[in-house]
Amino acid sequence: MASNSGNDSKNTLYCSFCGKSQHEVRKLIAGPTVFICDECVELCMDIIREETKSAGLKSDDGVPTPQEICGVLDDYVIGQAHAKRVLSVAVHNHYKRLNHSDKSDIELAKSNIMLIGPTGCGKTLLAQTLARILDVPFTMADATTLTEAGYVGEDVENIILKLLQASEYNVERAQRGIVYIDEVDKITRKSDNPSITRDVSGEGVQQALLKIMEGTVASVPPQGGRKHPQQEFLQVDTTNILFICGGAFAGLDKIIAQRGKGSAMGFGADVRDPDSKSVGEYFKDLEPEDLLKFGLIPEFVGRLPVIATLEDLDEDALVTILTGPKNALVKQYQRLFELEDVKLTFTDDAMSAIAKRAILRKTGARGLRSIMEDILLDTMFDMPGAEGVEEVVVNEEAVNSDTQPLMIYAERKADEPASAS
């Protein structure tokens, strides 16, 4: 018997790439002196597809076309067709301007971008995906942490420092990068009337951002300015850096609605239910004057000529977000359960119920993970200690009530086929 087991181990074939045996994979393909398994083949195909996609995103002048940019955005961001078109055209024109700046006497001005939309609708993801497509340095900054120079908080120059760090201190690359400033709606004026007291985190930050957004040579301290005052400064020209500002602008829809009401009154007036339109629908009618009333200063709005408004995500879009993208939430949790040798299944009704809960919470796609955690918390707590669990099924009852997801055991599966339906 010992000799037979020794022969079996000698005859066992292994993948030359990952080292798995023929018994651990579905298929092992033989080549001259090497073997490759089906899992490694799939991995190689994914790598080739990604490289082909990024290599294909180049037109004759080295800049992806708007259609190509929009096509890749579709792979990562669900919905928001109008915002994708606006972004694709603006980014294409920006990098085309950079590549042809020396070939004409006409100087093309930069068009920074403002993204306005409800929370959890994909503003940040759009900016991150753009940077990935174009292979340029990208950094995100939180506007709420910024203050005027000389006050407690971060200086505006720290944004350029983060971009330098993302480009590994290559100044030339950093000068063609993308900066995304989030929560820009939180740096609005505290009131419409100018005050005798300084607004160092609101209007003061807008004033400080004006120069770097328009284009200036910023003196950037490599280690941060306030802690190391004696260091040498790096000179970074911000003229060709693309700035994208994003914010939820809570309450802006009311300003837009008020502007559209007019002065009609009496029996002939058009009476509308204030809840009949969503926030995203109001944003479609946005005018620059609405942003001024919200608290942005005219000079700041003028530095952001391209405005893309995003819509609320409906039920179908949220269900697609749960299952569609490469790193979809459902796939993430299924992988977690796979590590416990348990199959996780969601019914179609459960998906719809999760999407409806996210809409009621008004948290957009960002709230989906919180809902999934609530549903699966007790199951994930009990499952590692439970023996024989083969499958967990999440149905509509588990989403809408305190009912736990169904746990199907291996020895009971033949006796209880109806419990999973």
UniProtKB/Swiss-Prot annotation:
Gene3D superfamilies: 1.10.8.60, ClpX chaperone, C4-type zinc finger domain, P-loop containing nucleotide triphosphate hydrolases. Residues 3-56 form the ClpX-type ZB domain. InterPro entries: AAA+_ATPase (IPR003593), ATP-dep_Clp_protease_ClpX (IPR050052), ATPase_AAA_core (IPR003959), Clp_ATPase_C (IPR019489), Clp_protease_ATP-bd_su_ClpX (IPR004487), ClpX_bact (IPR046425), P-loop_NTPase (IPR027417), Znf_CppX_C4 (IPR010603). ATP binds at P118, T119, G120, C121, G122, K123, T124, L125. One of its GO terms (cellular component) is HslUV protease complex. Zn(2+) binds at C15, C18, C37, C40. PROSITE patterns: CLPX_ZB. GO terms for molecular function: ATP binding; ATP hydrolysis activity; ATP-dependent protein folding chaperone; protein dimerization activity; unfolded protein binding; zinc ion binding. The keyword Metal-binding applies. Signal peptide: none annotated. Keywords: ATP-binding, Chaperone, Metal-binding, Nucleotide-binding, Zinc. GO terms for biological process: cell division; proteolysis involved in protein catabolic process. Component of the ClpX-ClpP complex. Forms a hexameric ring that, in the presence of ATP, binds to fourteen ClpP subunits assembled into a disk-like structure with a central cavity, resembling the structure of eukaryotic proteasomes. Belongs to the ClpX chaperone family. ATP-dependent specificity component of the Clp protease. It directs the protease to specific substrates. Can perform chaperone functions in the absence of ClpP. PANTHER family: ATP-DEPENDENT CLP PROTEASE ATP-BINDING SUBUNIT CLPX-LIKE, MITOCHONDRIAL (PTHR48102:SF7), ATP-DEPENDENT CLP PROTEASE ATP-BINDING SUBUNIT CLPX-LIKE, MITOCHONDRIAL-RELATED (PTHR48102). This is ATP-dependent Clp protease ATP-binding subunit ClpX. It comes from Jannaschia sp. (strain CCS1). The lineage of its organism: Bacteria, Pseudomonadati, Pseudomonadota, Alphaproteobacteria, Rhodobacterales. The gene is clpX.
